[in-house]
Design a protein with these regions (language model features):
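Glycine- and charge-rich intrinsically disordered segments
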Residues: 1-21
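Class I S-adenosyl-L-methionine
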Residues: 19, 23-143
Length: 143
């Protein structure tokens, strides 16, 4: 038995959806995941799957979304977190190493990207870790 609201209907994969719809779904999932980061809760596979299913209305098993899209939602959630709490991190300490430690604490809550699609492997697509992105921004003088 399936709980999918799309049971019996053909499911259009997120990757083949119009770009605006795909982006909106990823952003919706990211907003769900933002609460995990804000509460200091680790985002595991079940939490990520729940956020994606809620945003898209179907499971990965149905082909409506893949883990590449799910990992993109996590990355967007990290950006949302930094937009919201970055100024507080910046105000907490003037030491850039202490700031980096706070950023890394958030990064450790994100899941590792172990489920890689053939496309990701073929193009050697890897994400920039949050800490490295923060260091690059710091070096560039972004505040």
């Amino acid at each position: 038995m399936t709980n999918s609201p799309l049971a019996g209907a053909s499911v259009r994969p997120l990757a083949s959806a119009c770009p605006e719809q795909a982006a909106a779904s990823i952003i919706a999932a990211a907003h769900d995941l933002l609460g995990h980061f804000a509460a200091g809760r680790r985002i595991d596979a079940p939490a990520l799957r729940t956020a994606m299913q809620s945003a898209i209305g179907a499971s990965d098993a149905s082909g409506a979304w893949d883990w590449k899209a799910a990992y993109e939602a996590v990355e967007v959630a990290q950006l949302l977190f930094m937009r919201r709490y970055g100024p507080a991190i910046h105000a907490k300490t003037i030491d850039p190493f202490e700031r980096l430690q706070l950023v890394e604490r958030i990064a450790r809550l994100a899941p590792t990207q172990t489920r890689r699609s053939e496309e990701m492997q073929a193009y050697q697509q890897f994400s920039t870790p949050l800490g490295l992105a923060w260091v690059a921004g710091f070096a560039a003088g972004f505040h």
